[in-house]
């Protein structure tokens, strides 16, 4: 069977990302090892262009999406128009247990004129601290941002975010920006994380900017009492806290679509967004997982399940392609006989 260059590249990516051995992965895909390593050597030497064949590519694509899957993807896109092609692809795999790639979803949506420009342009923030975290609760980022309630004025949202997983541990809508507001939010984070109830060798390190509430002696004393160390970002360089800065922009892109006339209305909308962000929003930097799955240690189980779905789907499409090709060949033989 002849494969197009794009199909070869997809198989190479699949083998590279597989959680099982190369031999077992290729066996499940029905690809001889000698064939795969020939492709791989050409790919490493000449990039994707090296996978092109000199002879014309086959007319029939073996892993084309079935019509029923195409309609299901379009239905999900119409049901949840706020999702990007990447988020739609991951959501479809998790919900339907059938693999579709981001590229396939993008081409499908584009063909049906369902690709739209974002309502807001997000400025890029630095995503990595100088000393990257390797597990939850090693480093917490915290910051304030402003939100307005009509007839009441400005309120200040204090948030604590886990650096490793981006999980929102705690938030508080405040009328001031004092050290007490900060320590109250941190106390909620300690309770929500469970660290308040257990003895741990190292408490999370806190990362903040140099605002008055963060450099105060009152907060410093509170942190010492609770066994936490404190790192402050470089002055006039807010991108040190890239993850919480990005969270604030994502949150405001949704929250500011509505007007609020009572603080309680704003708090309710914030609670809804935090729940969505933590539990249902796929993050590309987290291998397309929501923060809660990473924070609570479910990541590897989900990624392994997705990999199995991908292998099973590709094998199913390959079998269907062979069946279709065999049926077509039989029909042609009957016509010519």
What are these regions (language model features)?
Residues 41-139, 237-238, 295-302:
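Basic, flexible linker segments flanking DNA-binding modules
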Residues 68-69, 98-99, 107-161, 167, ...:
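Mobile-element integrase/transposase regions
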Residues 19-21, 83, 100, 261:
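Residue-level signal for the short linker/turn that defines the boundary of a DNA-recognition helix
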Residues 1-79, 228-229:
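Residue-centric detector for conserved, function-critical "anchor" positions
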Residues 186, 197-216, 234-236, 287-292:
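Acidic/histidine-rich, metal-coordinating catalytic segments
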Residues 171-172:
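Short hydrophobic alpha-helix segments
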Residues 203-210, 224-243, 257-263:
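RNase H-like polynucleotidyl transferase catalytic core
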Residues 2, 224-228, 249-337:
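C-terminal domain-tail junction helix/linker
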